[in-house]
Regions:
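Transmembrane beta-barrel architecture of outer membranes
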Residues: 36, 96-100, 136-140, 178-182
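Activation segment
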Residues: 25, 61, 76, 164-167
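Transmembrane beta-barrel domains of outer membrane proteins
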Residues: 1-4, 52-56, 102-106, 144-146, ...
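Gram-negative outer-membrane beta-barrel transporters
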Residues: 6-21, 37-122
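Transmembrane helix-loop junctions in multipass membrane proteins, especially transporters and channels
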Residues: 23, 27, 31, 120-121
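Flexible, surface-exposed loop regions and adjacent strand-edge segments
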Residues: 28-37, 77, 81-90, 129-134, ...
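C-terminal beta-signal and adjacent terminal beta-strands/loops
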Residues: 118-125, 143-189
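Short, glycine/charged-rich beta-strand-loop motifs at protein surfaces that mediate ligand recognition
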Residues: 15, 127-133, 140-144
Length: 189
């Protein structure tokens, strides 16, 4: 669905999918966090739903934008029906549920954006069904100012990553950095 007017844009989209993949190559940290190994899944089966909703408002000085995404999927190994340890088990590092929300508020040359990300449980090994990475949430914020002097654009951006300082791991025993800050200055001709 899509709606347009002079000030508003709204859209909603949902896709249902099913994939059967032969010889799927996945890169996994099987020999430590710095040495990744290529793994060939002979046959995988994936089905899921992607949904996106987006809204935007524009006026002379103001801009508001909101984007939401949701993905649910069942992504399983169907290589060897006789292998109880791996058959019909989730593909490593493939979450069943993930979602995100991004909001942007702009006023003239100033813009504040916030993004929220949720990643659900995901297995990281077939060796033990308890080898599950816990779900995590992440919130980032960014404040941007841009000023034009003739044809030259000068800008500054202050970004706070992992605003709530939540500790999480993309791969086992390798925690992502906590809250951190970035300042970016730009000059464009």
């Amino acid at each position: 669905y899509h709606y347009d007017s002079p000030h508003w844009n709204l859209s909603v989209q949902a896709d249902v999918y099913q994939n059967k993949i032969e010889n799927r190559i996945v890169c996994l940290p099987l020999k430590g966090t710095y040495t990744w190994s290529m793994m060939n899944y002979g046959y995988t089966f994936c089905r899921g739903l992607n949904a996106t909703a987006q809204g935007r408002y524009n006026s002379a000085d103001w801009m508001f934008s909101l984007l939401g995404t949701l993905t649910w999927q069942s992504d399983v190994n169907r290589t060897d029906p006789d292998d109880e340890d791996t058959y019909n088990k989730p593909i490593c590092y493939s979450p069943a549920l993930s979602s995100g929300i991004t909001s942007v508020i702009g006023w003239r040359n100033l813009q504040l954006s916030t993004s929220y990300l949720y990643v659900g449980e995901r297995m990281w090994s077939y060796a033990d069904p308890e080898d599950v990475l816990t779900p995590y949430n992440n919130i980032d914020m960014k404040l941007t100012y841009t000023h034009h002097i003739g044809k030259t654009a000068v800008g500054a951006c202050l970004e706070v990553c992992d605003l709530l300082d939540e500790q999480y791991e993309h791969i086992p025993r390798y925690p992502m950095p906590g809250r951190n800050y970035k300042l970016t200055l730009t000059f464009g001709i």
